[in-house]
Each structure stands twice: as structure tokens, then as C-alpha cells.
Swiss-Prot record:
Entry annotated with the keyword Cytoplasm: yes
GO biological process entries: defense response to virus; DNA restriction-modification system
Keyword terms of this UniProt record: Antiviral defense, Cytoplasm, Restriction system
Gene: drmB
Protein's name according to its UniProt entry: DISARM protein DrmB
General function of this protein: Component of antiviral defense system DISARM (defense island system associated with restriction-modification), composed of DrmE, DrmA, DrmB, DrmC and DrmMII. DISARM is probably a multi-gene restriction module, this subunit has an unknown function. Expression of DISARM in B.subtilis (strain BEST7003) confers resistance to phages Nf, phi29, phi105, phi3T, SPO1, SPR and SPP1. Protection is over 10(7)-fold against phi3T, 10(4)-10(5)-fold against Nf, phi29, phi105 and SPR, 100-fold against SPO1 and 10-fold against SPP1.
Gene disruption phenotype: When this gene is missing the DISARM system does not confer Nf, phi3T or SPO1 resistance in B.subtilis.
GO CC list: cytoplasm
Subcellular location: Cytoplasm
Length: 561
């Protein structure tokens, strides 16, 4: 992370001291991730997060000096806080070195400058290092690192894995402070600011209040005081609830007396004592039910939505259109990976570096995103009919499913959900509509996110945006959900997808690993920012929606355009 004067790494959550930050509760997400609660990430200037400089090696900005030094040598915190890193030779400002090294086990450490300068050999030499530039070109060939002992080497090849065959990983995790593990993996050179240095592992859920807001509030209350209640029960024994009620709950609006409290506490325990694991798809199923269960309007806590009338010409394709005036998403940071993206949609993704709390409490950092959205449920009957009438679709569906399964297995992950042609159709529709909405709603396509609901008895998409501000977003997106505005948006999005500026090349693409598991799709027609997409711009095919110049089957929206 770049700061004003330096590059920093935020320390693991066990080093955080902000224990007064708000606790966040979501029963399904907590059970899915096996956590007691989540804690809100501090966002004000009065609540800092602990961080350290990284990389440790810095370069003097004075080109006549160009000292390459380890900041940890003779480090003085007061001087560092005043003006950032300074050269130990000439006291000029210094900047963090451009290169670092990582490995497939997600370790991260400084580039081995001394090893490199001495001909890629281990050495006992402690001479001063300098990073010189010949100034001839901007390539690495023009840079070389030189030791005081006169050993020197050009940085040519410094970004090639093959240059580090004799150098093994140090097992370092800079965010864990002096914790190193034994690791013999070969290192991978990286640019310090490259996107593959850090891939966050995130899980999220749309908060769906229960039918009774009182029950929802009680769940949160009991979850927050569960440890205190257990302490009372252990210390006092029988009839502990009378003491707890008199000490802490007298006058509490949710409980009339101690007997009412113990009855509701017992009910809470009975509803939360299941040891059964929750899959991520079950969280989505609960969200899907919430969007499809009410008749006209619903307003419960942070969930406020209303149904739009589906026009006659849309009814063969859509069962329901919902304007979500108010949504709350809980976004949890599990940990991270380097060099590759984390495993999707599972509660314990493999190979990620998990954030570790201090041992006394089992939590993860999270943020609450308040926003708005548009939910569209597809017509299940039409989907079934479309699949039955096109003999080529089962083959294409199997192609997508097998490609996705092979990709998951190649990563060493477990195949949990089948991504068939219905998912690809829904996913592509979401992308096309995001691109069109960004032109009309006032939000860029980067700000609009998708949630795809596909599975048994599920076929829908949620497009939403939000902000960490309690007031949420500005209403521009949900306004586009009004049918008089949404109808032309959908039609325009589909018409734009018929032709691509990369046709005929794009239209002839077949599903393949070389094309990111996509069929007829590219950045010109179907792809959006990866922060908006559930699957990293994979599993897209516009030919499933509209007739392209190379279509081999009837598209889903055949009769609409």
C-alpha cells in the first residue's frame, strides 16, 4: 500500500488494538465462515491501523548517491515519522525499491539485492550497495546494482523466474512481524505495485432481515452478549438468569422480566445450535427467496424493495423485476493470495493466507456497504423450453461445465457448483446490462456489481451499488429500475450485443481455456471491470442471448428484438 512518503504493509488483525470498533453480525455468514462475529474496519483518522514499511530496501533519490539500503538498519521512528525514509549517506529523501519476490505459498520478501550484486551467489560481504542507471534506456538493462567491493550486475533478467533457480524462498510474511516458516519454493520476481502482489479473499452477503424485525434484533443482541451470559451461567449456576436480568436488563424494552429473557435466550440457542455447515449457495438461496417472496412492497430494517409490473412483451422472459431502494451488504476479508486469485465461493479456500485474530476471539474484519439495486428474475418455463428446443445447447452447456470443472481442478480446488449454460446466459445478461446502466444511471461500470442466482429453482441477477456511508448511494441506479426506463435499457443492451467491433473474430470464438472459459465474448462487447464481476470475466457468451453473425442456435431473447 502506497502512503504519502513510503510503501506500507498493514499488519495482521492480531496486532490491531481497535477493539472498540463496531461488531457486525450476520448469522448465515458467521456460520458459513465459522466465526463468532465480524469487526468493522476503522475508517476515521482517529482509529489507525498498525503498519510497517515494506519493502525494507530503499533507494536514495540523489542520483549522485543512489545508495540502496535496508531501512531497518539504524531505524529511528521519530525521524521516519517526520519526513519519511532518508538516505543514511546524504540524508536525501529515499523511495522504496521497485522489486520484491514472492512464491506459490504466498510469501513475500525483499528482492535479494546483495545476492544479485555478487553474481547471484550467497556472500558474507557487508559492503554498501548502490543502484545506478546508465540513462541510455528505460529498460532494466540500463540499471545495475554495485557493491562497495566492486562486484556489480545488471538488472537484465531480474523479472524472469529462471534467474532465481538457485535462490529459495525465505518464508517471510511481512504482515506477521518476524514470523518466518521453512519454505523451499522457488521465488517469483514481482514489481512492488503489480496487481498480482495481492489478491484479497472476500466473501459477502446481502443482509436479509427476518420476517420479524424484533427477532432479528434479538439475534444480534444475544450474539453480542453470549460470552457474558455464559460467564454468568458458569459462575452462578442455577437461576443465573435472575442475576443477569437484574444486573443488565432491567428496563430493557425487549424483555418484560427474567422469565421472558430466559425463554427468548433458550429459543435463540435452539435456533443457532446446529453444527451443520452452510454452503455459499445457501446464502444466495436465502437472498433469492427474499427478493421473490413478497407481493408488492417490503420494508424491514436495511431491506426495502418494491415490485415493478413486468410488461407483456417481457413476460415470456422475466417473472419479476424488483427495485431495491435499500440494501446492506456485509463484505468480509478472509485473507489474501499472491500471484493468483483465491478459490471462489467456499468457506475455507485453499492456499490463502488467513488473517489471524489474537486467539481469545474468533473474528474477521468487515465493512457494511449500504446501497441500492435492481433484481430481475428470469422465466423458468421459458428457460426450460429454450433448452429443449435447441439441440446444440446441451453440448455447449457440457463444454462450459467441463471447462469450469477442469479449471477449478487445475488450481487444486474442489468442484462444488456446476456452471452450466444457464449460468453463462444469466451472467452475460448481467454484464450487458451493467455496461448499458453505466451510461444512464450516473454510476460508472466499476461501481456496479453483480450477484448471479443460478441453481435449483433459481434464475436471476442482482445489479447493485453502494457506499460505506450510512445513507447509502444516491438513487440513480434504482431509478433505472422503473419499467419505463429499464425496458429500453434492456432492449438497447441486447441490440448492442448483436454486433461487436471485434467481429467476425469475436463471434466465432468457442468456449476454451485460452479465452478465459468464455465463448463469444471480449472486452469490446461483454466484459466489465473485474471488481464488478463474480468470476473474473469468465463464463460469458453473448450468442446465448442474441443472434450473432455466427450463431448456431436460437438465442434466449429470440422473440424480443
Amino acid at each position: 500500500m502506497d502512503s504519502v512518503n513510503d510503501s506500507l504493509v498493514i499488519l495482521d488483525i492480531k496486532y490491531w488494538t481497535n477493539h472498540n470498533n463496531k461488531k457486525i453480525f450476520d448469522k448465515n455468514l458467521m456460520k458459513f465462515l465459522k466465526k463468532d462475529y465480524f469487526r468493522k474496519i476503522p475508517s476515521t483518522k482517529h482509529k489507525d491501523l498498525p503498519a510497517i514499511p515494506f519493502p525494507n530496501y530503499h533507494v536514495c533519490s540523489n542520483v549522485k548517491c543512489s545508495r540502496l539500503f535496508d531501512l531497518r538498519d539504524n531505524f529511528v521512528m521519530s525521524d521516519y515519522l517526520k519526513g519519511g525514509p532518508k538516505c543514511p549517506d546524504c540524508s536525501r529523501k529515499s523511495y522504496p525499491a521497485r522489486f520484491v519476490v514472492s512464491c506459490q505459498e504466498n510469501h513475500l520478501d525483499d528482492f535479494p539485492w546483495r545476492w544479485w550484486a555478487h553474481g547471484k551467489q550467497d556472500t558474507e560481504c557487508k559492503g554498501k550497495l548502490r543502484l545506478w542507471s546508465t540513462g541510455n534506456t528505460s529498460s532494466l538493462d540500463s540499471l545495475y546494482v554495485e557493491c562497495e567491493c566492486k562486484k556489480k550486475k545488471s538488472l537484465r533478467g531480474a523479472m524472469q523466474d529462471s534467474s532465481f533457480e538457485n535462490y529459495k524462498c525465505t518464508g517471510n510474511h511481512p504482515h506477521k512481524l518476524n514470523e518466518k516458516s521453512n519454505c523451499n519454493e522457488p521465488v517469483i520476481p514481482l514489481q512492488r505495485g503489480a496487481s498480482n502482489v495481492y489478491f484479497p479473499a472476500l466473501r459477502s452477503a446481502i443482509v436479509i432481515p427476518s420476517n420479524a424485525s424484533e427477532d432479528n434484533n434479538l439475534d444480534d443482541f444475544f450474539t453480542s452478549v453470549k460470552e457474558v451470559i455464559n460467564t454468568y451461567a458458569d459462575l452462578i449456576g442455577e437461576n443465573w438468569h435472575y442475576k443477569f436480568y437484574s444486573d443488565r436488563l432491567t428496563g430493557h424494552s425487549e424483555f418484560s422480566d427474567a422469565e421472558d429473557f430466559i425463554a427468548k435466550w433458550t429459543s435463540y440457542l435452539n435456533s443457532n445450535d446446529s453444527e451443520e455447515e452452510i454452503e455459499y449457495n445457501q446464502i444466495k438461496e436465502a437472498e433469492y427467496r427474499a427478493f421473490t417472496a413478497f407481493d408488492r412492497k417490503v420494508k424491514m430494517g436495511d431491506f426495502e424493495a418494491e415490485v415493478e409490473t413486468v410488461p407483456d412483451d417481457f413476460q415470456p422472459y422475466f417473472n419479476r423485476i424488483v427495485k431495491a431502494h435499500r440494501l446492506k451488504e456485509i463484505l468480509v476479508l478472509l485473507g489474501f493470495m499472491r500471484n493468483d486469485s483465491p478459490e471462489p465461493d467456499v468457506n475455507e479456500p485453499k492456499k490463502i493466507v488467513w488473517l489471524e485474530s489474537d486467539g481469545y476471539e474468533n473474528w474477521l474484519p468487515a465493512i457494511e456497504v449500504h446501497g441500492e439495486g435492481i433484481f430481475i428474475e428470469f422465466n423458468h418455463t421459458t428457460i426450460s423450453k429454450w433448452l429443449e428446443e435447441n439441440s446444440e445447447l446441451p453440448k455447449r452447456s457440457e463444454k462450459f461445465s467441463s471447462l469450469y470443472a477442469s479449471w477449478i481442478e487445475s488450481k487444486g480446488w474442489e468442484v462444488r457448483d456446476e456452471k452450466d449454460i444457464v449460468y453463462v446466459m444469466l451472467h452475460t445478461f448481467a454484464h450487458l446490462l451493467i455496461k448499458q446502466l453505466s451510461l444512464q444511471s450516473g454510476y460508472s461500470s466499476v461501481a456496479i456489481k453483480e450477484r448471479i442466482y443460478c441453481g435449483k429453482n433459481m434464475a436471476g441477477v442482482l445489479l447493485y451499488t453502494g457506499s460505506t456511508d450510512q445513507e447509502g448511494s444516491l438513487g440513480g441506479l434504482v431509478e433505472m429500475g422503473s419499467i419505463d426506463k429499464l425496458r429500453p435499457l434492456i432492449v438497447d443492451a441486447l441490440e448492442e450485443a448483436i454486433f461487436c467491433s471485434n467481429d467476425p473474430s469475436c463471434a466465432s470464438l468457442e468456449p476454451s481455456e485460452d479465452n478465459q472459459l468464455n465463448g463469444c465474448a471480449c472486452f469490446a462487447c461483454s466484459m466489465v471491470a473485474e471488481t464488478s464481476c463474480e468470476t473474473g470475466n469468465r463464463l460469458l457468451d453473448r450468442s446465448l442471448l442474441v443472434k450473432t453473425i455466427d450463431s448456431k442456435y436460437s438465442p434466449f431473447f429470440k422473440g424480443l428484438l
